[in-house]
């Protein structure tokens, strides 16, 4: 029945609110949690922020496995700080999503049931220390490229969370580069091959 597929007609009041909302975004204003927003905007934000939060939490796992096996005490301390940062990023983002009226339990239920996703890069195993370095240098480097524009997104709580996340991701990228650089410049031929393989 084609009538079932039709969207409901919006009232003049809803159209006026949506025009004012779009004008605020066009002017570069932040939309805050208590501001009126169209339902499709809210749903899109919940989906995007939750996927991002899930990726930060799941992203702790491949590197967390290496905390006890890092090659030096210095590397262990750096990796532990990085894993803690990633957990914090997930928490900042869950808090930003909660400002949209969704609970953390709902977000996690969606992840556990498969209705919500996370970045598939974290499904690849970290078989050796070079894999950990590549995650820091290249995966976190790619994340920075994707996430810096989010510091200027229209939703204020998300944008503010991203400012801190991006600063910390820069540290993560530097530690990944440094770990690989040490392996390439001071490592054995087997370690250099390991970096190339990673």
For every predicted segment, state its role.
Residues 1-37, 75:
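Extreme N-terminal leader/anchor segments
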Residues 56-125:
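N-terminal hydrophobic targeting segments
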Residues 2-19, 82-110, 176-183:
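Conserved alpha-helical segments that form or flank metal/cofactor-binding pockets of metalloenzymes
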Residues 157-198:
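A contiguous pocket-lining binding segment that forms or flanks enzyme active sites
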Residues 36-41, 59-81, 143-158:
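Helix-loop segments that flank and shape redox-cofactor active sites
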Residues 29-50, 110-136, 153, 186-191:
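Acidic/His metal-coordination segments adjacent to aromatic residues that form catalytic metal sites
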């Amino acid at each position: 029945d084609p009538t079932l597929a039709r969207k409901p007609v919006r009232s003049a009041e809803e159209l006026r609110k949506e025009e004012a909302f779009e004008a605020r975004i066009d002017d570069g204003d932040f939309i805050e949690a208590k501001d009126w927003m169209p339902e499709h905007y809210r749903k899109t934000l919940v989906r995007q922020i939750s996927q991002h939060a899930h990726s930060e939490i799941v992203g702790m796992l491949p590197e967390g496995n290496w905390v006890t096996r890092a090659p030096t005490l210095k590397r262990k301390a750096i990796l532990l700080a990085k894993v803690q940062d990633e957990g914090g990023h997930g928490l900042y983002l869950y808090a930003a999503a909660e400002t949209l009226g969704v609970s953390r339990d709902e977000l996690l239920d969606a992840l556990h049931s498969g209705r919500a996703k996370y970045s598939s890069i974290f499904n690849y195993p970290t078989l050796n220390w070079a894999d950990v370095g590549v995650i820091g240098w290249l995966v976190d480097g790619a994340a920075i490229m994707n996430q810096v524009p989010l510091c200027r997104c229209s939703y204020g709580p998300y944008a503010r969370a991203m400012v801190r996340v991006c600063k910390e991701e820069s540290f993560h990228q530097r530690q990944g580069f440094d770990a690989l650089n040490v392996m390439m410049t001071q490592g054995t031929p087997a370690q250099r091959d390991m970096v190339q393989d990673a």
